């Protein structure tokens, strides 16, 4: 039996309009006032207002991630049973702020903990039918990949210093064969670092999806690093060769990628399933679209 989607374009449009009116206009107005105050010599007050505007966007970014997931679950049907959450996501927005900041404080070494902790918190507040989701992903499962990404720039830098000390880079200029060699090193650095980043994210997604459960159902996400690379290359080619018009199709590609590699296993006892008692919004969650965040 197939899952059904009950959302409408009008809901998403209304959600987007509400975000513009309730958050967008006040944000731009506050930013304009802050700049005007700075121009008139009230630097401290202007800087304070500007900081408030940025912190507000930071906070609403976390709320947006929560409410977007809540909306999608509330519009997903299976045997007329839907999902959702009784939480509005406002407390999650605070968790998103402090956990993200803590993740960056020790030179970024706690970023895997921040990502997995936020995943667990968000999904643990969601439900489908009468049963809540459970998520207990651990940062240790992805830390090795993250450490590889984290240390790669330092290893490359030390390697270039050693090569320079040995005279292997002596005399390299910016033109001719020498320039091409330097360009190749820079290109390898960025492509290699990007590939390691994709490898980390692929491992992260396999870890967190595999640690998510609903009643007796367990989930897995089987996309490999190469699958992610193919997806990103396809995205880039689609946008470039359509002169940017293909951007509107990226969310469909991402959703297809997600559903193709997602697997679920376990037993569903139909007699236990009842309709969800969570609240359903009358409009789509336009926050996430307004902040230009990806569907996955």
Where are these regions (language model features)?
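Hydrophobic alpha-helical transmembrane segments
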Residues: 13, 48-52, 93, 143, ...
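Hydrophobic alpha-helical transmembrane segments in multi-pass membrane proteins
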Residues: 19, 23-31, 107, 149, ...
